[in-house]
C-alpha cells in the first residue's frame, strides 16, 4: 500500500480526472491521504491554460522534489509545455492516460519512470466508464464531454483535450441518478465548452438538461461555461430548458473581447452583437440571471480603442462577474507567434478593468439587500459561518444552516463577491 496525495489545479474537468485517479488507486489497495506531508507520492494534476499558473506548478513540483517527495505529473501541462517539468519526476501522464495511474505509482515505488502522453487523436477514454472517489460535498462534478469544436488562436487546452467527444446521455443520466442517491444536491455539468455538447452525437445541451430535470428529487443543476457561437444554434431551446426550477439561473458566457476585430483574430467565431443578443434573450426570460463572462486583455494587436470597446461592453451589459485575464502566449498556439504588447500596458488595462468589474458587481449585489431568497447550504465557511448559494448561484454567507439543506434566507448586506444574510425559515 502506497500513501498518495492528489493536488489538483485548474478547472472542474481536471478535478473530475483527479477523482478518477483517486478511485483507481483506492480500489488497487493504495491510500489517498489528505496532505502532501502524509504521502509517499504526490500526484500534481496540472493546468496549462495560463503562463502564471504553469510557472506556479513548475515551482511546486521542484519544491516537492526538493523535500524528498516522489512526484507524478498529470493533466494538461505534459501536452502543452513538458519542458518546464523537472526531469526528476517519477512519471508523466497525459489527460488520456489517467487510467495508467496505478501503474505509474507502482513504477515509481520501484524506481522506474513511466511516461505516457499520447496525442488525443491516437487514444481516447470515455471517462464516465471509470469509478470516482469524490469528496462528500453538496455538489458533484459531472463531465459531459471532453475537448471542443473551437480553434481559438490563444488556447492550448485543445492541444491536450482534443476535439469534442460528447459522452452518451444514458451514461450521464446514470451518473446523475447515482449522485442523487448518494445525497448530492447539486450537479455541475462540466466540459471545456458545454455549449457544443452533443453536436457530435446528434443531440444538444438543452435536450440533456431536459432529461436531467425529469429525474425525481430535490436537486439543482449548474451548467458550466459555454461559448456564444454554439449557443446561438439552439438559443430558444436552451432558454426553455433553463425554465425548469432545477436549473440554476446562472450563465457563464465568455465574450473575451468587446472588439470584433480582436474576436476575429482570436478565432472566436461570433461578434459582440451576437454575444449581446444571447445575454438579452436570457435576461428577458430570467431577470434575476447571474451572468458571468471572461475578458482577455492585452491580446496581440489590441489597440487602446479596442480595449476601450471591451470596457464599454462591460459597462453596457453589467455582468455579475467578469473574470479578467492578462493575455499570456502559450506554446503551440498561433497567437504566440504574433507581436506581443508591452507587459506594463497589459497590466494597466487589467487593473483598470478589474476596478470597473468590482464596482459593477458591488452595485448589482447591493440590490439584493432586503430580498428573500431560497438557498442551498454548501457547508461550513470561515469564522463559524456557513456558505450557501442562491437559486441563481450567488454566494451568500449565513450564520447557521445544515449542509445540503434548502432554506429561505433574507439578504442583510452585500460585497462585490458575496451576499450576507440570515435564515428566516
Swiss-Prot record:
InterPro entries, sorted: Elp3/MiaA/NifB-like_rSAM, Methylthiotransferase, Methylthiotransferase_CS, Methylthiotransferase_N, Methylthiotransferase_N_sf, MiaB-like_arc_euk, rSAM, rSAM_horseshoe
Cofactor remark from the record: Binds 2 [4Fe-4S] clusters. One cluster is coordinated with 3 cysteines and an exchangeable S-adenosyl-L-methionine.
GO-annotated molecular function: 4 iron, 4 sulfur cluster binding; metal ion binding; N6-threonylcarbomyladenosine methylthiotransferase activity; tRNA (N(6)-L-threonylcarbamoyladenosine(37)-C(2))-methylthiotransferase
Gene3D superfamilies, A to Z: Methylthiotransferase, N-terminal domain, tm_1862 like domain
Pfam family, one: TRAM
Entry keyword S-adenosyl-L-methionine: yes
The protein's name: Probable threonylcarbamoyladenosine tRNA methylthiotransferase
MTTase N-terminal domain: residues covered: 2-110
Catalysis: reaction(s): N(6)-L-threonylcarbamoyladenosine(37) in tRNA + (sulfur carrier)-SH + AH2 + 2 S-adenosyl-L-methionine = 2-methylsulfanyl-N(6)-L-threonylcarbamoyladenosine(37) in tRNA + (sulfur carrier)-H + 5'-deoxyadenosine + L-methionine + A + S-adenosyl-L-homocysteine + 2 H(+)
Organism for this UniProt entry: Pyrococcus horikoshii (strain ATCC 700860 / DSM 12428 / JCM 9974 / NBRC 100139 / OT-3)
Record-stated family: Belongs to the methylthiotransferase family. CDKAL1 subfamily.
Cofactor(s) needed: [4Fe-4S] cluster
Domain Radical SAM core: start-end pairs: 134-363
Lineage start: Archaea, Methanobacteriati, Methanobacteriota, Thermococci, Thermococcales
Amino acid at each position: 500500500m502506497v500513501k498518495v496525495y492528489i493536488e489538483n489545479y485548474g478547472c472542474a474537468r481536471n478535478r473530475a480526472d483527479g477523482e478518477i485517479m483517486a478511485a483507481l488507486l483506492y480500489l488497487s489497495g493504495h491510500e489517498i491521504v489528505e496532505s502532501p506531508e502524509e504521502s509517499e507520492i504526490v500526484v500534481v494534476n496540472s493546468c496549462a491554460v495560463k503562463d502564471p499558473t504553469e510557472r506556479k506548478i513548475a515551482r511546486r513540483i521542484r519544491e516537492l522534489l526538493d523535500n524528498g517527495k516522489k512526484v507524478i505529473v498529470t493533466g494538461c501541462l505534459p501536452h502543452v509545455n513538458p519542458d518546464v517539468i523537472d526531469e526528476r519526476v517519477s512519471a508523466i501522464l497525459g489527460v488520456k492516460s489517467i487510467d495508467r495511474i496505478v501503474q505509474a505509482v507502482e513504477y515509481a515505488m520501484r524506481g522506474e519512470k513511466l511516461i505516457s502522453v499520447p496525442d488525443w487523436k491516437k487514444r481516447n477514454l470515455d471517462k464516465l466508464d471509470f469509478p470516482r472517489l469524490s469528496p462528500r460535498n453538496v455538489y458533484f462534478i459531472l463531465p459531459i464531454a471532453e475537448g471542443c469544436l473551437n480553434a481559438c488562436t490563444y488556447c492550448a487546452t485543445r492541444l491536450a483535450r482534443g476535439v469534442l467527444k460528447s459522452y452518451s446521455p444514458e451514461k450521464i443520466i446514470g451518473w446523475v441518478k447515482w449522485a442523487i442517491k448518494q445525497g448530492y444536491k447539486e450537479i455541475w455539468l462540466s466540459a471545456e465548452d458545454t455549449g457544443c455538447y452533443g453536436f457530435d452525437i446528434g443531440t444538444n445541451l438543452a435536450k440533456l438538461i431536459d432529461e436531467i430535470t425529469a429525474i425525481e428529487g430535490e436537486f439543482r443543476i449548474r451548467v458550466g461555461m459555454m461559448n456564444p457561437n454554439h449557443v446561438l444554434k439552439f438559443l430558444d431551446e436552451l432558454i426553455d430548458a433553463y425554465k425548469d426550477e432545477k436549473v440554476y439561473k446562472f450563465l457563464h458566457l465568455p465574450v473575451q473581447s468587446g472588439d470584433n476585430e480582436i474576436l476575429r483574430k482570436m478565432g472566436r467565431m461570433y461578434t459582440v452583437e451576437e454575444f449581446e443578443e444571447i445575454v438579452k434573450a436570457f435576461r428577458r426570460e430570467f431577470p434575476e440571471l447571474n451572468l458571468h463572462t471572461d475578458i482577455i486583455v492585452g491580446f496581440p494587436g489590441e489597440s487602446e480603442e479596442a480595449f476601450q470597446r471591451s470596457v464599454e461592453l462591460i459597462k453596457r451589459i453589467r455582468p455579475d462577474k467578469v473574470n479578467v485575464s492578462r493575455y499570456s502566449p502559450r506554446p503551440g498556439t498561433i497567437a504566440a507567434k504574433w507581436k506581443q504588447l508591452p507587459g506594463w500596458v497589459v497590466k494597466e488595462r487589467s487593473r483598470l478593468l478589474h476596478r470597473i468589474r468590482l464596482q459593477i458587481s458591488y452595485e448589482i449585489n447591493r440590490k439584493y439587500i432586503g430580498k428573500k431568497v431560497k438557498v442551498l447550504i454548501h457547508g461550513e465557511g470561515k469564522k463559524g459561518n456557513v456558505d450557501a448559494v442562491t437559486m441563481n448561484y450567488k454566494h451568500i454567507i449565513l450564520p447557521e444552516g445544515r449542509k445540503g439543506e434548502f432554506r429561505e434566507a433574507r439578504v442583510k448586506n452585500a460585497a462585490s463577491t458575496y451576499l450576507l444574510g440570515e435564515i428566516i425559515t
